[in-house]
Amino acid sequence: MLNHATLKKEAVRRVNTQFLSAERVAEIINRKGIAECIAGVAAYIEEDFLRWNDFDKCARVANHSAVGVIELMPVANARTYAFKYVNGHPANHRYNLPTVMAFGVLADVETGTPDLVSELTITTAIRTAAMSAVAARALARPDSKTMALIGNGAQSEFQALAFHHLLGIETFHLFDIDANATDKLVANLTRLGLKTRRFSDTRKAVKGCDIVTTVTADKTNATILTPDMIEPGMHINGVGGDCPGKTELHADVLRQGPVFCEFEPQSRIEGDMQQMPADFPVTELWQVLSGEKVGRSYADQVTIYDSVGFALEDYSALRYMRDVATELEMTETISLIPTLANPKNLFGFIADKRDAQGPVRAAVALAA
């Protein structure tokens, strides 16, 4: 928060916006450790979810096309405003581009000053996995040891690491319609010392698992999981159904047990629960974390977490990355906002730059 007395003494105030590039975030993760980063983001998420009512929240603003979606995800409290820009284009691999690309901003509510601009493509993968783990710790059986990963794309390693380090999952059952994706995941998880088993279809992969994570990318009303695949005590972590017309769970799977979500107004539009009537009962996860509502009631109960990704999680992740960058002395700044001698004279800023370039132009002209 700005000190007004200090502001009055300053003739010119320079706004230096902290910047975290993709390369800098990767360096931060390597120095801190990916497991610690996932755990750290999870802790920040829990902290912010327990302050749920302090935030001004809304469903994300989405622009849909035939090939994908572009979204803005805002959230704010009394001190800080945050947003994420994110896309979802399942066919981007054809152009050698990620399916999901994102960046985000933290800004000061009092002045509107952008304090941080950060990549969020890598960070979103970490926060999504961290959020899945936060939900599973509240909803899955505490003795869970095996998890099926249906969909072995860019998010899958992060999910596996989150569930291994935060919940103690020991073995991962893997399936993807793209065998190359599973090859990649097996290689990466084996390198990290995690146990994997690959399967030829979803039904075989989920059999006997304590937790089932679906994280597929196709923008279609799919039925990755059907009711006959669900076993007593399972926790379903549905990650991939995250926009209108994009689902992973058969509607009857949602009737197998209590359904939990992040922000109900958004989840009813975007989650697997978009298939259900408006009065279908759901519980927001913050209510479970705060103790207001019950999560899992008994060991054989099936629990379903219908995740779509919510702006508050990105706020948490941005806070974490900013704080760790500061801790590791890895901050850098950019000049995003012009420094004005007179805040009412924006045109003068352009003129000053033109005048400063005058001698350079004259020297170039003489040399010619």
Identify the residue ranges that each predicted region occupies.
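N-terminal ligand-binding/catalytic initiation module
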Residues: 1-125, 133, 143, 312-315, ...
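N-terminal Rossmann-fold NAD(P) dinucleotide-binding loop
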Residues: 156-157
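NAD(P)-binding Rossmann-fold cofactor-contacting core
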Residues: 166-192
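Rossmann-fold NAD(P)-binding glycine/threonine-rich loop
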Residues: 229-234, 238-294
